[in-house]
Amino acid sequence: MNENISADKIRLLAGVRRIVVHPGLAHVDDIMSCAMAYAFGVRHDAVIERRRPEPADLDDLETLVMDVGFALDPARLDFDHHQRSRDEPPRCAYALFAEWLGVDEEMRRLFPWYETWNAIDTLGAHATALKLGTTGDAIAGLVAHPLGEWVIRHFADNPEFRARVALGLGKEIDKTRRSWESLREKTKTLDVAGLPVADFRDCPADEISRCSDIWIRLHRPACIVCYDNRGSGLTLLRCNDDVRLDFHRCAGRPYALFAHPGGFVLKTQTRDDDLKAILADARTDRT
């Protein structure tokens, strides 16, 4: 998966023995910086140290310094952003690391959190909310949600948990990147009843759960179809609240196992149910 990263950079990362991030309260930036380091080639037994780097650390190619140190020097594996001026593009530590690797565009495409948390870390939650066309109060529950807050506190306080979280998140990044490449090859785009449909029936459930949202964002289908992972039929999911589809219109049809009252999900009785007939029934512009 890292074939587009230069051999010199891969060798540099393979030699890293420790990752130094800032002490005190942890943030998404330093946690995901560690995760991305593991995902893109740092050996999994490299220890995470939460402390201020010494001058020798900034020169040591066995030490990857992330989000601390007031230095951006990729050749020495130093990736901090706190010394950058307001006139420079807002880039947190993990974004600077990704730019150096040449995977910044890929990360933006595959992971919605990537750009949002880059903005929150560099601009602040209030300015990010304004950038998104809303208010700080409106996104407060997303920024400070209970799972994230719990992980952040324990990442700061528990070295064993810290390593497990960073390694686990790094593996998730790697799995999603691999799953996306596989899903791209297997997904078919169909024209059914005059609607663009993403057909995921050749894709394993894990690939769909990881990557279907990516496909939807990039290709904007009216709906997706896949095999029901809880039953013996099909699952159809309306995308982007497409006004042309309301699957609740299918309720009571012989093929319908479950039609969500909200109109965005339909589960069918069998895998052989007629997709064209189903979508024709669900069209809101047809009687």
Whereabouts are the PLM-identified features?
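Active-site rim beta-loop-alpha module in soluble metabolic enzymes
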Residues: 152-216
